[in-house]
């Protein structure tokens, strides 16, 4: 089995870029950024429970990484960079720390490296469980209205919240809930030590108004790029700034 994806071929010899979206996003999320790198092969993946991969069930990160590997093989992508936002960033970090073959570099935007104690994990498990129950039972417009009131999204304007709520409400609540539980931050190990031992380039992007993830970026051995005029979802709020950072990283 493989994940649904959109593939755009590039020039021979150019790096392949594999883009992973955040929770409730889909393969279109990164395209405004990725399509500025038309010399590179670009693969935009729908994670399980999302977009064209809605019907693909997973029990945890191991299943997601296995599906990611199978998808890359199916497109004959043997050397690549992973670029992931939030949930996609956590999947990318997990894949990197598990030694996914062919990975040349890692770019994470607003991805958490992992909780550091059992109390924090227990609290997160309860919180994600409550959200999952709401995704299963309530209209998605109501759930996402509240979702985007969380502190991490404090920099969004009312208009941005409204647009995101409308966009994300096109999802399937049941499969979102299942993916939220399967890939909860509570189920993710603390990756700091493994990330600090990576043998290939690791870059971290965060919006200048995203104080939580700017602080987390200092806890891993990554080169940090702060995206101006942006909060947690920097590639949506300032795509040109993220394009500039990626161009520097990839030296294109």
Swiss-Prot record:
Keyword list, A-Z: Lyase, Menaquinone biosynthesis
Pathway: Quinol/quinone metabolism; 1,4-dihydroxy-2-naphthoate biosynthesis; 1,4-dihydroxy-2-naphthoate from chorismate: step 3/7; Quinol/quinone metabolism; menaquinone biosynthesis
Protein family membership: Belongs to the AB hydrolase superfamily. MenH family.
UniProt entry tagged with the keyword Lyase: yes
Keyword Zinc-finger among UniProt keywords: no
Pfam families (UniProt xref): Abhydrolase_6 (PF12697)
Entry superkingdom: Bacteria
E.C. designation(s): 4.2.99.20
Entry's Gene Ontology molecular function annotations: 2-succinyl-6-hydroxy-2,4-cyclohexadiene-1-carboxylate synthase activity
Function: Catalyzes a proton abstraction reaction that results in 2,5-elimination of pyruvate from 2-succinyl-5-enolpyruvyl-6-hydroxy-3-cyclohexene-1-carboxylate (SEPHCHC) and the formation of 2-succinyl-6-hydroxy-2,4-cyclohexadiene-1-carboxylate (SHCHC).
Catalytic activity reported: 5-enolpyruvoyl-6-hydroxy-2-succinyl-cyclohex-3-ene-1-carboxylate = (1R,6R)-6-hydroxy-2-succinyl-cyclohexa-2,4-diene-1-carboxylate + pyruvate
Protein name: 2-succinyl-6-hydroxy-2,4-cyclohexadiene-1-carboxylate synthase
Subunit structure: Monomer.
Top-level EC class as recorded in UniProt: lyase
Annotated InterPro entries: AB_hydrolase_1 (IPR000073), AB_hydrolase_fold (IPR029058), SHCHC_synthase_MenH (IPR022485)
Organism: Salmonella agona (strain SL483)
A biological process from GO: menaquinone biosynthetic process
């Amino acid at each position: 089995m493989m994940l649904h994806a959109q593939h755009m071929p590039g020039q021979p010899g150019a790096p392949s870029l594999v883009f992973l979206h955040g929770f409730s996003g889909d393969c279109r999320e990164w395209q405004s950024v990725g399509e500025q790198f038309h010399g590179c092969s670009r693969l935009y993946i729908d994670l399980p429970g999302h977009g064209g991969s809605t019907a693909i069930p997973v029990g945890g990160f191991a299943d997601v990484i296995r599906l990611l590997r199978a998808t890359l093989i199916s497109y004959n992508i043997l050397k690549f960079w992973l670029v992931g936002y939030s949930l996609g960033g956590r999947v990318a970090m997990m894949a990197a720390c598990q030694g996914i073959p062919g990975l040349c570099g890692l770019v994470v935007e607003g991805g958490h490296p992992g909780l550091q104690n059992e109390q924090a994990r227990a609290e997160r498990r309860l919180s994600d469980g409550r959200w999952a129950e709401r995704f299963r039972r309530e209209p998605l417009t109501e759930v996402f209205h509240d979702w985007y009131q969380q502190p991490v999204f404090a920099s969004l304007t009312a208009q941005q919240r409204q647009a995101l709520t409308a966009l994300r409400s096109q999802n399937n609540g049941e499969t979102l809930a299942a993916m939220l539980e399967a890939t909860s931050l509570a189920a993710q190990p603390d990756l700091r030590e493994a990330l600090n031992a990576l043998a290939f380039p690791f870059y971290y992007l965060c919006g200048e108004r995203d104080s939580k993830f700017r602080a987390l970026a200092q806890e891993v051995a990554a080169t940090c790029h702060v995206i101006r005029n942006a909060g947690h979802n920097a590639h949506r709020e300032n795509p040109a700034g993220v394009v500039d950072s990626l161009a520097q990283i990839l030296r294109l």
